From Swiss-Prot:
Pfam families: KH_2 (PF07650), Ribosomal_S3_C (PF00189). It comes from the Bacteria. One of its GO terms (biological process) is translation. Binds the lower part of the 30S subunit head. Binds mRNA in the 70S ribosome, positioning it for translation. The keyword Ribosomal protein applies. Part of the 30S ribosomal subunit. Forms a tight complex with proteins S10 and S14. The keyword Transcription does not apply. SMART domains: KH. This is Small ribosomal subunit protein uS3. The gene is rpsC. Gene3D superfamilies: 3.30.300.20, Ribosomal protein S3, C-terminal domain.
């Protein structure tokens, strides 16, 4: 039986970077649980900000650096920084450590796999046509520069009695090529008929080509 490898883990250390950048054998369990609490708190509290990624660094004991990548940074910052103050207070209560907070904007959320998946899931929850939502996401991503995109939804689609899987693919998607920059996102849509899973793969080109273009 064939097994699928996670696209991010497959490229980790080659074309993808670690989301938690620290090493500590003595306090590993404590730090790991702390990381999970931080991610969970930010995701739940600022879901409307379109949080794509959270990177956590621990340059030295007792210090934490948190970088939030989101589509709508204004939601997290708030008017005159009011929301950031609330976020800082919430994190201080949660981890009781000194920390540095950085907020980065996702320039093209249309080509961010997790944000695309969350947008489709949100539309499905609002009873929109899943096919229309998938086609719209594919069209927008390709127009914004994606080289290829695949979207897969599974569950009781349109309230069907039997769960099934449907997917659309546009462009190229070289999953087995390590140099290919592939973004992957997964989320779920909660409907009256049950949970519908949404998976998105977006191919953004080869890493070597992107570095040469940036240089």
């Amino acid at each position: 039986m064939g097994q699928k490898v996670h696209p991010y883990g497959f490229r980790l250390g080659i074309s993808k970077d670690w989301k938690a950048r620290w090493i500590n054998e003595k306090n590993y369990k404590e730090y790991l649980l702390e990381d999970l609490k931080i991610r969970d708190y930010i995701k739940k509290t600022y879901h409307s900000a379109g949080v794509s990624d959270i990177f956590i660094e621990r340059p030295e004991p007792g210090k934490v650096s948190i970088t939030i990548k989101c589509a709508r940074p204004g939601v997290i910052i708030g008017r005159k920084g009011s929301e950031v103050k609330k976020l800082r207070a919430g994190l201080e209560r949660l981890i009781n450590r000194k920390f540095q907070l950085n907020i980065e904007e996702v320039k093209t959320p249309e080509t961010d796999a997790l944000l695309v998946a969350e947008d489709i899931a949100s539309r499905i929850e609002k009873r929109a046509s899943y096919k229309r939502a998938m086609k719209r996401a594919i069209f927008t991503a390709m127009r914004k520069g994606a080289k290829g995109i695949k979207i897969m939804v599974s569950g009781r689609l349109n309230g069907a009695e039997i769960a099934r899987t449907e997917w659309y693919l546009e462009g190229r998607l070289p999953l087995q090529t390590l140099k290919s920059d592939i973004d992957y996102g997964y989320t779920t849509a909660l409907t009256k008929m049950g949970i519908i899973g949404v998976r998105v793969w977006i191919y953004k080109g080869d890493v070597a080509q992107k570095k040469a273009t940036e240089a």
